[in-house]
């Protein structure tokens, strides 16, 4: 199978039918990896999809991958979150296509916002680095309490709290558009 045969697009209301499959894929990946992935509700992901704040990958009508975008601090910070590829489609470079699409979407919708990503996975760190993200400490991220509340759904939340929100199992990575003025979207 070739990743190019899989359609990667901005999700819309017609893709809401995939939410349960997305949630199950994320849950299973968290079990296999043994690391924290913050759980989200059906309603939360459905809203992201309906608002056009998500990227979905489909092989015909079959779910292949997903990610969504969240904005914080009055849209001064934007996170690309929940990147997942169904096991059947792993190893094809699909996650890189999904990540690049979410990066473009975030840059188009919020061109001056700082983009950040939290990850414990080497592959995502590599993709982020290729896009221009750099590792930062957590205190360089948004101070928006709604963002930090979302971390409560992660199995590693106690570590984050015990370190006064400065460190966690995840690596925080930041893309500052002010430092990439010559980059095109």
PLM features: residue spans?
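Conserved acetyl-CoA-binding loop-helix of GNAT-fold acetyltransferases
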Residues: 85, 91-106
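A conserved beta-strand-loop-helix scaffold within acyl/acetyltransferase catalytic domains
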Residues: 23-87
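Terminal substrate-recognition subdomain of acyl/acetyltransferases
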Residues: 1-3, 107-185
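Amide-forming acyltransferase catalytic core, primarily the GNAT-like/NAT-type
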Residues: 16-27, 31-38, 164-180
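A short beta-loop-alpha structural element at the N-terminal edge
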Residues: 2-22
């Amino acid at each position: 199978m070739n990743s190019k045969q899989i359609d990667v697009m901005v999700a819309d209301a017609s893709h809401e039918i995939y939410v349960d499959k997305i949630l199950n894929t994320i849950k299973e990946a968290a079990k296999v990896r043994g690391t924290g992935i913050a759980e989200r509700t059906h309603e939360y992901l459905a809203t992201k999809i309906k608002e056009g704040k998500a990227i979905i990958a489909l092989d015909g009508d079959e779910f292949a991958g997903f990610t969504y975008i969240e904005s914080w601090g009055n849209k001064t910070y934007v996170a690309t979150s929940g990147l997942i590829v169904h096991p059947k489609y792993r190893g094809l470079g699909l996650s890189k296509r999904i990540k690049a699409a979410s990066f473009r979407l975030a840059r188009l919708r919020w061109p001056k916002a700082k983009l950040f990503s939290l990850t414990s996975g080497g592959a995502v760190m590599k993709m982020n680095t290729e896009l221009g993200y750099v590792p930062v400490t957590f205190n360089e991220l948004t101070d928006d309490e709604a963002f930090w509340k979302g971390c409560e759904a992660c199995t590693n939340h106690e570590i984050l709290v015990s370190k006064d929100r400065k460190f966690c199992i995840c690596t925080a990575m930041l893309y500052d558009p002010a430092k990439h003025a010559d980059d095109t979207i």
